[in-house]
């Protein structure tokens, strides 16, 4: 819902304060309880994964018993421990976003011109001002530039200025987290984030020519992109008729920002494949993408594409609106999009709508530290100081972020009885159906749980809502922190299966 009046917000805030007070009492009760034994099937799968039970922290509790936060869980195992939730941290960011911004919130990208238009020529500069839109993908950038042309502009005598000043400049090196700089999940937030700073390559075999053609999206100006690659029937080390590790067989060469190429071959058995990579020079990506697309649609530019600020005296000729926050959090949670989560996280300190609801002022430019403080203040106002999350970038792509399963369960219970419950639950993967849980092997809980997943090299996690056949709904939070954590995913799915069965009793 959107809160249009001060009175509506105060009523809503009072209700949440009461929920927080109830939750605080629940916390004390849960903390005093002895740990509940883990189900036998979960224990067996943990042993198979060589993960000790001490590496597990979990809680299963009713989502809304009588519309109140429940004090007595069905299962509580080390639920007060602070653990790394991996991408399950996105639940905190997206629920905070729904509460502070509202489900219908949109990001606007203003476009300015600073000169007259004569005979199809803009005699001045075009300015595109980024305001943190998490989903300014190529299709929407194309529409934005077509709107520029609809103003009668076919040529620009000056420059195209890209204003990225709404966010503090990132000092993040794409390879810092795990040494994988070309993985799109490592892209840093940007006020003018275009197409996730990624290049999408589509490989299409043409057996007649012995080549696989390569289509690149977007067209990056002044970057050579290899048009085709030789095909191989049986690459070395690959069984006949199998695709194998086709990415490695291509022998990619991504380090040069002026060239994307391959020195290997493409297996015939692979058919058509798509590969997305993060561009080697993220600082120049936006300039290259805008120029490449402007030229592709027939636009001419007398100057160049460069960074610059929109003059304060100018008014935009139009603003390009993003999809709603409801749509954005579906991408964040169902597909665990890290950079979109970080864009939302940064927005929370930049938006006057969000900060005003906490009695604070917006920060310019937005920064990670300012956003951490916004989310901490939001948590304190909703839930008190208990189980206060340790925040980094809000996406879970971090070695430092921490939550307690107990605190996360309380948040999910509160969300369940809130006006934004449909939007939050609808953003979560449905086990065995879609998103990051589409390929779940669970047969008991398939279609019966909405869960956010998280995986790092030493953490695996699930959290969300489980539904039983008799209509009972449970909150499940389960997190494993261990070097073998990824192998413990079946154990977490077994806990979800157990919750489905227990909920039906």
Which functions belong to the PLM regions below?
Residues 31-67, 75-82, 147-150:
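Beta-lactamase-like hydrolase cores
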Residues 21, 26-27:
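N-terminal signal peptide c-region/cleavage motif recognized by signal peptidases
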Residues 69-76, 335, 345-505:
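Small-residue-rich helix-loop
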Residues 33-49, 99-386, 494, 501-505:
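Conserved serine DD-peptidase/penicillin-binding transpeptidase domain
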